[in-house]
Amino acid sequence: MALVSMKEMLKKAKAGHYAVGQFNLNNLQWAQAILQAAEEEQAPVIVAASDRLVDFLGGFQTITSMVNSLLIEMKITVPVALHLDHGMTIDRCKQAIDAGFTSVMIDGSHSPIEDNIAMTKEVVAYAQPRNVSVEAEVGTVGGMEDGLIGGVKYADLDECVRVVEEANIDALAAALGSVHGPYQGEPKLGFEEMKVISERTGVPLVLHGGSGIPDYQIRKAILLGHAKINVNTECLQAWAHAVRTILTNDQDIYDYRAITTPGTEAIVETVKTKMREFQTSGKAKERV
C-alpha cells in the first residue's frame, strides 16, 4: 500500500474518538518494528522522522526509500503516513515533501506568533497541492527530545485560532502540559484549555510527549479532540532495557542481530500496546 497523507486519517480518528499513534524511527529496525506492529494490529500508523535525526538516518531520500521499500517487502496493507517531526525550517519541510514525505510539521512555536503563522502559511501553500498534510505547533512542549531542550509554555487560545484559520493547517499541536522525555511525577494536562481550543479550532489536535501519560488522561485527551498522539521515549526505553539485559547477561555476545533483535521485539510490543491504548487497533478497515 502506498504512503498516505494523515489528513483523512486524523479526521476519521477525531470523529471516531480514537487517536492514531506517531512513532519515531531511529534506524531500519525501528521502521520494521513499527510497521510490523501496525500490520498485526490492523491499525493506521504515522511513521515519523525527527528533523534533528534526518541526517543521522541518511537524509530525506534515504528515509522515504527505506519506508516505501518496507511497505512492499513486508506486504503492509494498513494506511501509513510518513511524517517530518519538528521541521526546523520552511526549506527543510519542502525538502521532505520533495523526497516523498506525506506529512510535515513546521515548528514555529519558538518564534513570535506572526512569524509562526507566516512560516506555516508558506509550508501549507507548498504542501497542499502535493496532497501533503501539515501540522503546526502553538506554545512550547517542554522536556528534551533529540537534543532539543525546552520549558513548557501553554498554548494561547487566540493564537491557536489564528494559526488554524489563517494558515489552514490539518492538525494542531497545542502545548497543554505534556513534555518530551520522561515525566517527573504524574503528568497534569490542561483539560479545560484543551476543551476550549478543540471547540474553537475544530481541527484534530496532536499530543506531543505521549509517553508515560496515564491511560485515563490519554482517553480524556482523545475525547477532547486529540486524534494524533506522539510516542518516542517509551520505545527508546523498551529498546534500551532489552538490549542492556542481553549485554549484561552475556558478556561474550558480539553478534549484532543477536544483541539488537530483543530490542526490536520490545519496540513491536510497545507500539502494539500504545495502539490498543489509543483505540486504534482494527481501525485500518476504515480506509483513508
UniProtKB/Swiss-Prot annotation:
* Catalytic residues (positions): 85 (proton donor)
According to the record, the segments passing through the membrane are none
Q: What is its EC number?
A: 4.1.2.29
Residues with Phosphothreonine modification: 233
Q: Which CDD domains match?
A: TBP_aldolase_IIB
- Which GO terms fall under molecular function for this chain's record? 5-dehydro-2-deoxyphosphogluconate aldolase activity; fructose-bisphosphate aldolase activity; zinc ion binding
Cofactor(s) needed for function: Zn(2+)
In Gene Ontology terms, what is a biological process of this protein? Answer: glycolytic process
What's the protein here called? 6-phospho-5-dehydro-2-deoxy-D-gluconate aldolase
Q: What is the native source organism of this protein?
A: Halalkalibacterium halodurans (strain ATCC BAA-125 / DSM 18197 / FERM 7344 / JCM 9153 / C-125) (Bacillus halodurans)
